[in-house]
Amino acid sequence: MLAELLPGHYSNANQAYFDTRRGLPEQARHGLLDVVITPLEDSSEPGREFSWREKGAESRLVLTTSGDDPVGIRAAFETRKDGGWRTDPTRVLRILRSAGGFTGTGPGGLRLQVSARELWLDPGNGDPYWLERSREFHCYADIPGVGGGRDDCAHAHQGVGA
């Protein structure tokens, strides 16, 4: 279930915008943060390893379960080091199922919460980033005179006087 919820593009554009609009001091504002999570295609364990892109840097998020913890999921962030992937001990979480999603806790107050619509990230300072899941959509604009459409709009008001 967690493996189905995680993939997507998340952004805190609303949070960053309203922090500025409310006039919060610079040090209290949440900067714009975009996170893209995708399943790793070359994973030896599909549904267990993900690419996590944040601020132009890529990490791997590896999910594992253990018989020692029948209800928790271990989520470890790995960073590239010395030509390979190494677990960052400051970014290892224990994730549990909660109402409508999953909640993870880690060292130093690190917290992560994911649901169908959002991702909350707290680096440990108690002031989390609220990232909303982006929705993909297509927009087809009808521009008069372009693409073979009729150009009626340009002539609709000819001869109309006030």
Question: What are the residue ranges of the model-derived segments?
Answer:
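Calycin-type beta-barrel ligand-binding domains and close structural analogs
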Residues: 3-9, 13-23, 32, 47-162
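Short secondary-structure subsegments characteristic of cysteine-rich extracellular domains
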Residues: 27-41
